[in-house]
Amino acid sequence: MRILDTASAEYLSAHTGVASRHMVHVIGRNRETGAQEALGLWQGDDHLTIAINGANRTYYGAGGLIGVEPIRAGIGLEVRMLQATLSPLTPEVALLLRGYDTRLAPAEVHRGLLSLETGQLIAEPIRVFRGWVDEVKIKTGEVGGTSEATVTLASAARGLTRALTLTRSDTEMRRRNAGDRFRDYADIAGEVGVWWGEKRERA
């Protein structure tokens, strides 16, 4: 069950209408510097800087984020997929898709509630999805046509399906501790005969 702040709970319970915008935040690796950099997009008309969990984030508007498909919530460990449609013609989206390596990049989707009178956010946006970038597809339109990009996100449950990458080879153990020789002969252990309480036969 999602716990809402007081302002959001009162807004939704008023039954006078709801105005909301989605926000997508991705942390990708800069292809030139190798540094991890964050980039946010939202459905608003202007750029926005807002505190999320105590840290300021900048979300770029003006058409970069076209839309997010309906989010399906549920109980369990099922990996859920979510698609966001972007406009590759905006500089921020072009940077995200071509300037960053977004393979398995951490991503979050928030939902911001807007005042019906002022059009401003009434409270800190509510996180509605968290996971990783699973796939990016770019569709380039013909002359006079429409171009768009589709980013598919996999929910955080995907982390439970990852295999353990750490091996117990001698090389891996020495990488962690150069003096660790516990598995010095691990690669030939199955080929060496062992005699327990028996007379060893000579070859």
Tell what function each PLM region has:
Residues 1-61:
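Polar/acidic, low-complexity leader/linker segments enriched in S/T/G and N/D
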Residues 3-4, 8-10, 94-134:
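Short, acidic/charged, Gly/Pro-enriched secondary-structure junctions
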Residues 64-66:
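Outer membrane beta-barrel transmembrane domains
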Residues 68-73, 135-141:
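Short amphipathic beta-strand and strand-loop transition segments with alternating hydrophobic
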Residues 70-106, 113:
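Extracellular/virion structural assembly segments
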Residues 80, 129, 147-149:
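Envelope-exposed proteins and targeting segments
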Residues 138-153:
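Short, solvent-exposed secondary-structure boundary/capping segments
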Residues 158-203:
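Intrinsically disordered, low-complexity terminal/linker regions enriched in Pro/Ser/Gly
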